[in-house]
């Protein structure tokens, strides 16, 4: 991966004397976070390891922990969540967030109806909205510093449009569903 050998945004922020921390609940950071402080719940070699498939609420606890121990009011904290990653959308949210039914309960999205698949994906969005609101609540309690939150996904997701599922198609042929990434 090029990120192992090239500076990235986290390196630049850190070089500006801004405390930089990566809190991960997704697969590896692919070397993007190698040179900053990291709390990684899914890396088996990490002292913070919990296990793969843990719900994203764990990053909120990590955020609280970091805010309690931060050394500077100038801090960048990245929350790397599982979010809406497929194929097991139904594993990305607790049962109480299953608002759209029927939902797909399979690791093989093409085995479900498009309605079931879309419902499962939409349930991940409901849970992600909850996680974002919890992060905002935590930041609002920080009275001694000004805070803001930016949310962006790392990619979009194909949900059966034209028979295409998931993500990671090469850019030159990727459908718009995979490359259109909203930001809040």
Per-region residue spans from a language model:
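Catalytic domains that recognize anionic headgroups
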Residues: 1-184
């Amino acid at each position: 991966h090029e990120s192992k050998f090239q500076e990235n945004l986290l390196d630049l922020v850190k070089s500006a004397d801004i405390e930089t921390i990566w809190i991960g609940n997704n697969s590896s950071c692919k070397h993007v976070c190698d040179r900053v402080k990291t709390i990684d719940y899914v890396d088996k070699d990490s002292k913070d390891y919990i296990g793969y498939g843990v719900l994203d609420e764990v990053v909120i606890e990590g955020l609280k922990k970091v805010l309690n121990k931060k050394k500077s009011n100038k801090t960048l904290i990245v929350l790397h969540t599982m979010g809406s990653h497929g194929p097991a959308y139904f594993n990305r949210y607790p049962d109480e967030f299953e608002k759209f039914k029927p939902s797909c309960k399979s690791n093989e999205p093409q085995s479900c109806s498009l309605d079931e698949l879309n419902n499962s994906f939409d349930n991940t969005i409901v849970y992600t909205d909850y996680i974002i609101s919890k992060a905002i609540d935590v930041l609002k309690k920080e009275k001694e510093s000004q805070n803001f939150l930016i949310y962006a996904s790392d990619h979009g997701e194909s949900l059966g449009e034209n028979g295409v599922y998931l993500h990671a198609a090469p850019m030159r042929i990727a459908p718009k569903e995979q490359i259109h990434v909203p930001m809040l």
